[in-house]
Amino acid sequence: MKNNKIYINKKILLKLSGECLKKGKKNLVDFDILNKITNEIKNLFNLGIQIGIVIGGGNLFRGSQLKIHGIKRNIGDHIGMMSTLINGLFIYNHFERLNIKSQLISPFPFNINGICESYNIFRINKILKKKIVIFCFGIGHTLFTTDSAACLKAIEIDANLLLKITNVDGVFSEDPAKNPNATLYKKISYDYALKKNLKIMDFTAFAIAKEHKLPIRIFNIKEPNSLYKAIIGKDIGTLIN
C-alpha cells in the first residue's frame, strides 16, 4: 500500500485477545490466524501509522478461571500475565519474519536479551515512531484485565482510537451464539453499554475510556482488511464513544 491518503487515526492501540489467536480447543495458537493478523498490522505500520498492541493470554490461561482447579486468584492472575508474554513472543517473532521492528514492553523490570524492556512513559512515544510496541503482562497487577490495560495504555500513548479485535462482528444486544436474532449495534455510548451490562469490557476499562473520551471500535478480525477499514473511518463493527 502507498501512503497517499490522509488517515483519521495516525496512532492506534490494538487490543488483541488471546482467544483471537486460537482455533478450536486444540490449536492454542493458530499460525494461519497469526499470519493474517500480523500481515494486516504490517500494512498499517508501513503506512506510517504508530501502533501499540496490548495482548491477552486467554488462549493459554485465564487467571480468573483457574480457581476451579484450586489455584488462588492472585497466583492465577500471574499465570495469566505470563501467558501474555508467550503470545507477545509469538507476535514478535512473526514481525521479525516480516522485517518489521517491534519491541516487547513490560510494566515492571524484566528483560529478555533486549527483546523485552521495562515501561518508561517518557521513552514510549520515541519507540512508537520506529517500532510496533507490544505491551505484555497487562498493567502488571492482579485483579485487572488486559482490557483495562488497553484503555490505560491508549490514553498514555495519546492514541486516537482503541481497536478491540474479536471473533464476532461487534457488540450485540445478546450473545449471537445463543440468539441468532440478536441485534448488532453500529454505534453506542459508554453509558448505554454500562446500563445494559453488555459484556464487551469490564467496568474498570469502560470507566477509564469514558473519563478520557477514548473512542473504541470493536470488530471481527475475520473480515478482510478490517484493520485498514477501521483506521480510515469505515463503518465496521461497533463504535463506542
Curated annotation (Swiss-Prot):
Regulation of catalytic or functional activity: Inhibited by UTP.
GO process annotations (BP): 'de novo' CTP biosynthetic process; UDP biosynthetic process
Molecular function per GO: ATP binding; UMP kinase activity
CC annotations in GO: cytosol
Pathway assigned in UniProt: Pyrimidine metabolism; CTP biosynthesis via de novo pathway; UDP from UMP (UMPK route): step 1/1
Compartments reported by the entry: Cytoplasm
EC numbers on record: 2.7.4.22
Binding positions for UMP per the UniProt entry: 57, 77, 139-146
Record-linked InterPro entries: AceGlu_kinase-like_sf, Asp/Glu/Uridylate_kinase, Uridylate_kinase, Uridylate_kinase_bac
Key words of the record: ATP-binding, Cytoplasm, Kinase, Nucleotide-binding, Pyrimidine biosynthesis, Transferase
Binding site for ATP: 15-18, 58, 62, 166-167, 172, 175
Organism domain of life: Bacteria
Catalytic reactions on record: UMP + ATP = UDP + ADP
The protein's assembly and partners: Homohexamer.
Family: Belongs to the UMP kinase family.
Protein name stated in the entry: Uridylate kinase
Organism of provenance: Wigglesworthia glossinidia brevipalpis
Lineage: Bacteria, Pseudomonadati, Pseudomonadota, Gammaproteobacteria, Enterobacterales
Gene name of the encoded protein: pyrH
